[in-house]
Amino acid sequence: MGRAFEVRKAAMAKTAGAKTKVYSKYGKEIYVCAKNGGADPDTNLSLRRLMEKAKKDQVPSHVIEKAIDKAAGGAGEDFQPMRYEGFGPGNCMVIVDCLSDNANRTITEVRNCFTKTNAKLGAQGAVSHMFDHQAVFQFEGDDEDAILEVLMEADVDVTDVEVEDGKVTVYAPHTEFYQVRTALTEAYPDLSFIADEISWMPQTETEISEEDMPMFEKFMDMLNDCDDVQDVYHNAVTPS
């Protein structure tokens, strides 16, 4: 599972290179979160976490504030979450999460990404049963037993704890996200997270051949260029 998360981080880092896309992604997510749960980060924990994550990804404060002000004012678009699943180049499994104010536009754009790369868009649930919806935390450290003890004392449900290359990765059911985060930060007030997110982690991996790589890269680039696409999860392992 740890390898899958490293693959996921590498894919996210590539996407993060396009700053305009990142700002737009966070602006939309923050707007929806503030609109649904309230614009005060002290009472809307999801908003607070999203703001912290945005700042860590160097999103300017004016982008964050604009999204919150827009939500607080009650105006703006009505974005709805949408999820698409299918098989990408090399027969890898793919989940595409979107936020959209126009369902017809979104499905047309996402379908085009699949069609133009000989990939196959599937029905709802086509591949998501092969992923685990997990809360994932990663930070520097090497004491697995101490981390497990902290989490057990806090009575939180944890799927796995891995230590590799001086980094601890904690996996838990997505419903336990805030309980795990609170337990860790209370035990280690100075803890700095390399990652703290809710993600879809693949149960299996699909090796992408050299022959399929150009089409796979085109597929990912096309999805990342879609304004409505927020996250792309896959089980592909690319040639090193």
UniProtKB/Swiss-Prot annotation:
GO biological process: regulation of DNA-templated transcription
GO molecular function, one term: DNA binding
Places the protein is found: Cytoplasm
Record has Transcription as a keyword: yes
Keywords for the protein's UniProt record, in alphabetical order: Cytoplasm, DNA-binding, Transcription, Transcription regulation
Source species, domain of life: Bacteria
One matching Pfam family: TACO1_YebC_N
Keyword DNA-binding: yes
InterPro entries: Integrase-like_N, TACO1_YebC-like_2nd/3rd_dom, TACO1_YebC_N, Transcrip_reg_TACO1-like, Transcrip_reg_TACO1-like_dom3, YebC-like
GO cellular component: cytosol
Cross-referenced PANTHER family: TRANSLATIONAL ACTIVATOR OF CYTOCHROME C OXIDASE 1
Membership in a protein family: Belongs to the TACO1 family.
NCBIfam families: PRK12378.1 (NF009044)
Protein name stated in the entry: Probable transcriptional regulatory protein MADE_1004275
Originating species: Alteromonas mediterranea (strain DSM 17117 / CIP 110805 / LMG 28347 / Deep ecotype)
